[in-house]
């Protein structure tokens, strides 16, 4: 299950809250068989520590995510996007401490470009926390990962998970509610 602190409409965190309810109602007995991930990095609350990659934001965000889902830990905690202001050492240090605390088993990156990924992975490895996975936007329309990122990931042994944001032919759009991020389109021919 792939979640993030800012997923949900009409309010951030609603996807995690709904998932937490489903986990409580019917999936809880399967927890050891589930891989649950969440992310932090986008706008979550107003103020200087409401987004990006500061230690304060990442720690607080994960604590809130765990509360919404009713969990003690997640399998994977991603940093959702690089932070142009916070030193990467602070962001990666926070991820290492999150794993050390037992609140996440593994860490991942999302939307990091090649050079950012190389720096982040190096810092994580130096601190004994390997980067398990990278989730870029990669599809027929967004192929930027082919400009070096895939090679960097292959060198370090990370898994790439495609975050497909587009349904080219609209085949599944008719099943989406009107408030979905996926626009409703007529059935393709």
Regions found by a protein language model. Give the residues of each.
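A short, structured active-site edge motif that brings together acidic residues
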Residues: 31-44, 135-137
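Acidic (Asp/Glu)-rich catalytic clusters
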Residues: 22-35, 66-70, 96-99, 121-128
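Active-site groove signature of glycoside hydrolases
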Residues: 66-87
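Glycine-centered flexible beta-alpha turn that most often forms the glycine-rich phosphate-binding loop
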Residues: 1, 74, 107
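Short, acidic/polar
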Residues: 52-69, 90-93, 117-121
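N-terminal binding-site loop/beta-alpha segment at the start of enzyme catalytic domains
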Residues: 2-35, 183
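Active-site mouth loops of central-metabolism enzymes
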Residues: 43-59, 80-86
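Beta/alpha (TIM)-barrel catalytic core signal, keyed to glycine-rich beta->alpha loops juxtaposed to Asp/Glu
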Residues: 82-189
């Amino acid at each position: 299950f792939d979640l993030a602190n800012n997923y949900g409409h009409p309010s951030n965190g609603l996807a995690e809250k709904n998932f937490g309810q489903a986990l409580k109602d019917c999936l809880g007995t399967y927890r050891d068989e589930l891989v649950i991930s969440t992310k932090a990095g986008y706008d979550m609350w107003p103020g200087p520590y409401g987004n990006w990659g500061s230690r304060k934001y990442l720690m607080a965000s994960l604590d809130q995510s765990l509360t919404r889902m009713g969990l003690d830990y997640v399998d994977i905690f991603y940093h959702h996007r690089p932070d142009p202001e916070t030193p990467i050492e602070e962001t990666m240090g926070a991820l290492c401490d999150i794993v050390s605390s037992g609140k996440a088993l593994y860490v991942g990156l999302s939307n990091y470009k090649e050079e950012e990924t190389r720096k982040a992975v190096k810092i994580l490895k130096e601190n004994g926390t390997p980067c398990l996975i990278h989730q870029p936007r990669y599809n027929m329309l967004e192929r930027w990962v082919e400009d070096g990122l895939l090679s960097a990931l292959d060198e370090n042994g990370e898994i790439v998970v495609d975050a497909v944001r587009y349904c080219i032919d609209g085949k599944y759009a008719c099943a989406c509610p009107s408030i979905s991020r996926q626009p409703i389109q007529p059935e393709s021919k």
